[in-house]
């Protein structure tokens, strides 16, 4: 497959595109799968070096046979930029060696999936699942257009034609013609047919989907250094912007030495924003140096100023036990109160999860250039929600969205943080103020201390068991800041529990919170799965078999659990000083289960994970190697979060500032073996980017419980916390 050096493409006006393409073009809506004429103002990023009509908004086939497929998803290392075109190319029956991939234009009405209401968002591990059916349909429609044109040219029935990779075949006359040749004369039908699902490819005939030889399109450029991230952007006349932001969210700035700062050589301007003071200078070094010289007085009336982590946990503990306090019901069925009264034994426990920072590798950045007359603008950024970023920039600049062109770039990590648009808005505000192209950069300290964290939360669980020791009553109350961010993962669709109540009691501390990889599934599945093991341990039941009973009505989940137990050799005799733990979780439609083997240094409190086994049902696997890498990555990020990561808030301000006091997992901590297996499935693809993270934390906690008889109920499991648990009476 041919590869371009950069993921972005020049935007063209509709008029220029039509003239260059030499034919008509239309858009295939990903959400409705209907042809739509591209309206004036839309700017398809299509290459114009060869004439020939665009078969659809998703693909451009040139007379020489080259095929450009347009990818609407952000590429941040998760592989969507290869996976989505693979799906389209499968139904198109394209020769993959002739395929090249470019980012699609930022046109959500055309490229927005149904999964997010038509928005171009790459979040929640739903790029592949969100586009799968629509891209198969669009690819099949493009194939139909090619075959229909050949049928008319050769005057043969369409039903007599078939395809091979990038070729239309008429077996009766032994004729064949390449897609490139067809593109040179093809015309578009007035209306595209809806291809019946049964006429799409049978999965057993897939050549590209599931093919382990299909390599990631972006990898060569990332290895040789030619891949372009937004942080690499340089444009003529560009200046640099940095911002001194409030250490406490909601505090307002007053700059006390503005005139002094403006007199410094190289300073273009200082700009007052609602949440900070921006410095624009001719070099980044100058901007950073001057930023350190700002004398800012911050207002003291911010809501977050009264918030501290430890006080919050005390507040949550009181809140979850208050019988008069009612929160938002997430799920309720049966008669919980009577079930608890009738229970043979009732268990209860409380779990805690600290704030977490996204820690994406590439610092936040964006470039915004306003036209000299202020009538239009260009934006360069890496974003998980480029349509939102485009709209946000337009709003700050006072422009209609059609007057803003956004060039998407690779992202050096996202994890949910880059689905927000604050860094693009800041760059736009500085560019508007100085009327020059501005490159805004966040330092690591900026990002960590003014971050949008995974919310702090506390979970209270109460469960009753019957005479056989099986759970039949379940009460779960979550309290913390972040509201909906805490709700995901609280429900248990694969466990059969007749009487249950799940409730969210949210508190607003005025903090900035955001989706973090796996969102609420991380803290919620930790609490749920650890609590289940505590009950099984007290009942002297095998935790694997205990879960099998809970899953008795869900064969898909059982298959995953049984698979991982077999992989790990569950029940085998372990070496002295070793223990195993097991846990189950579903994220983004993918049931997954993990087993880990640990050891414990009782003198230092350090837990060492030696082996991890993971089984996941991700439906049809589009890219096997990348799917495995994604699952491994989520497992390792999960390990990092459960052993090291914690943001502590005191009087509204983060007490950590960089990786010296916010450590993350290092190579020396990676397990000796990490085995991932995908359960064979004919289900449509489901999410894999976060599948491993929710179950690895409780698997470790459960192994610790099996080894020591003690429960770990506060993430992260630092040596200090482990020693405290071991020493507790």
Predicted feature locations:
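Cofactor-binding beta-sheet edge motifs in enzyme active sites
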Residues: 2-729
